[in-house]
């Protein structure tokens, strides 16, 4: 499953030096990291078996210097609509 992690980082130097995906289990895959220029916020996209699996791996490493929110997300061909939100019949239709 894909998991988005939203980080609010109190100590950017500590966080970014500790955040090395190569030291984690091969069961976890980091796809993208989107940090702000000052390093105090970031959004990362991971792939793992579950949110709990990822949380249990990351929190001991970065939890003391950041507040982290974890969300399961959907991704198909880089663009996805929420699967639980009904799509209107006209959504996505072009008016030509």
Label every model-predicted segment:
Residues 1-41, 47-57, 66, 70-96:
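Short S/T/G/P-rich N-terminal loop/turn motif that feeds into the first structured element of a domain
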């Amino acid at each position: 499953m894909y998991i988005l992690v939203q980080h609010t980082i109190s100590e950017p130097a500590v966080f970014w030096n500790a955040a090395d995906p190569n030291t984690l289990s091969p069961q976890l895959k980091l796809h993208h990291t989107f940090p702000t220029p000052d390093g105090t916020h970031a959004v990362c996209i991971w792939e793992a078996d579950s949110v709990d699996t990822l949380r249990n791996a990351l929190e001991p490493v970065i939890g003391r210097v950041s507040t982290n929110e974890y969300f399961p997300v959907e991704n198909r061909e880089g663009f996805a609509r929420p699967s639980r939100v009904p799509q209107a019949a006209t959504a996505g239709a072009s008016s030509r």
